[in-house]
């Protein structure tokens, strides 16, 4: 066992011992293995600047951006796992053939989606103004072995960012992003769909003409052709749900996910997380800065997103900020978040065995004394996979994962 894994096991054992008095001690029997998905010899990919993870038919597909060693170049890497993240393929440099700059970074991450043998990867490149630029699509039709250049969802060279990507059971790829095509000084939430893995895009439309300008968005698709987009609205900076019941052809703003009526003339740089259980229950984790209510909250919907439960505070008073959530089945749900502490930001995990009514005592996943942030969590065949970054002494960020069974 590596020093990293041994250290993580000891940390987890101590955390589990502290959680014995939890009203729902769901994580006490969990087996958690922490390591980096990247091999030690993947030297050029160790300094992570962003990442995304996607689950397709039980297999995991990841894309990362990284600062190349001794270079200002940002690399793009693809890797996959067929055993829930216990073992990963060697990272494949998929960006070098296209020689395009990368503006995507943590909080505005590169994105990946998969459907069968098809993969689509999208990132924000550099346009006329540094720090801004349009989206770039590349795709593979052979399980990620070879890659080709796709098209921009609008064919325009305007600034496009904070995108999310998902594939449905029919092989359609759905994309949302933010842009200011009306040039009215604020961003709108946009959508497009591709039936050929990003070679062409159709149904380009606006879902909301005014949204928060720098918070990430999250897509949720199901087998019935429903597509959901979780995003932060503008007039009140609460999270909102837009929904399509015809595979993206028509949309409506369905609901507010946590009605805090938060008025804020700025951007918190914080989106949310959304997941659907097998029985149809939708779970979400969101953050608000509303006065006397600031913090992270869990909500759930039993009527397909039309209405939501009362917000349930997550680790109240702990500084919980960026969060994600994943429903394994109709009863088991896990949340992950980062929280600011005296020694920097830490990554915490809690899970529920009763569909979100009660949660385990938060469990520390990240390394003690090292600042960790931007966690993600997805379901696997046997549990969950969590991913996050940890900032090292030289200010570079390393990528870590926790296999949770």
Predicted regions and their residues:
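C-terminal motif of bacterial Sec signal peptides marking the signal peptidase cleavage site
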Residues: 19-20
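Extracellular, repeat-based ectodomains that mediate carbohydrate processing or recognition
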Residues: 23-405
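Bacterial N-terminal signal peptides that target proteins for export
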Residues: 2-10
């Amino acid at each position: 066992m590596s020093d990293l894994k041994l250290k993580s096991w000891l940390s987890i054992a101590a955390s589990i011992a502290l959680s014995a008095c939890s009203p729902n001690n769901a994580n006490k029997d969990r087996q958690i293995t922490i390591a980096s998905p990247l091999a030690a010899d993947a030297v050029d990919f160790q300094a992570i600047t962003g990442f995304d993870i996607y689950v397709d038919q039980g297999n995991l597909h990841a894309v990362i951006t990284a600062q190349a060693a001794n270079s200002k170049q940002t690399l793009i890497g693809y890797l996959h796992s067929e055993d829930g993240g216990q073992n990963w393929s060697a990272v494949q440099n998929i960006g070098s053939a296209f020689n395009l700059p990368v503006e995507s970074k943590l909080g505005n991450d590169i994105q990946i989606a998969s459907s069968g043998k098809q993969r689509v990867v999208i990132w924000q490149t550099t346009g006329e103004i540094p720090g801004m630029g349009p989206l770039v699509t590349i795709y593979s039709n052979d399980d990620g072995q070879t890659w080709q250049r796709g098209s921009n969802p609008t064919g325009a060279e305007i600034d496009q960012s904070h995108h999310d990507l998902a594939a449905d059971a029919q092989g359609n790829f759905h994309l949302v992003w933010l842009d200011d095509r009306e040039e009215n000084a604020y961003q709108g939430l946009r959508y497009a769909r591709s039936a050929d893995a990003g070679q062409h895009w159709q149904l380009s439309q606006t879902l909301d003409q005014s949204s928060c300008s720098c918070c990430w968005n999250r897509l949720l698709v199901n087998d019935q052709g429903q597509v959901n987009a979780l995003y932060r609205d503008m007039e009140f900076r609460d999270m909102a749900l837009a929904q399509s019941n015809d595979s993206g052809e028509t949309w409506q703003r369905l609901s507010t996910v946590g009605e805090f009526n938060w008025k804020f003339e700025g951007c918190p740089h914080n989106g949310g997380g959304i997941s659907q259980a097998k029985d149809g229950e939708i779970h979400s984790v969101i953050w608000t800065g509303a006065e006397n209510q600031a913090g992270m909250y869990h909500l759930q919907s039993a009527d397909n997103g039309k209405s939501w439960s009362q917000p349930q505070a997550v680790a109240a008073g702990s500084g919980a900020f960026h969060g994600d959530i994943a429903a394994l089945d109709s009863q088991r749900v896990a949340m992950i978040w980062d929280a600011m502490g005296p020694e920097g930001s830490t990554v915490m995990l809690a899970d529920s065995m009763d569909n979100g009514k009660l949660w385990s005592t938060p469990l520390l996943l990240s390394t003690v004394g090292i600042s960790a942030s931007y966690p993600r969590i997805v379901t696997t065949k046997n549990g969950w996979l969590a991913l996050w970054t940890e900032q090292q002494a030289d200010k570079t960020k390393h990528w870590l994962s926790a296999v949770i069974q």
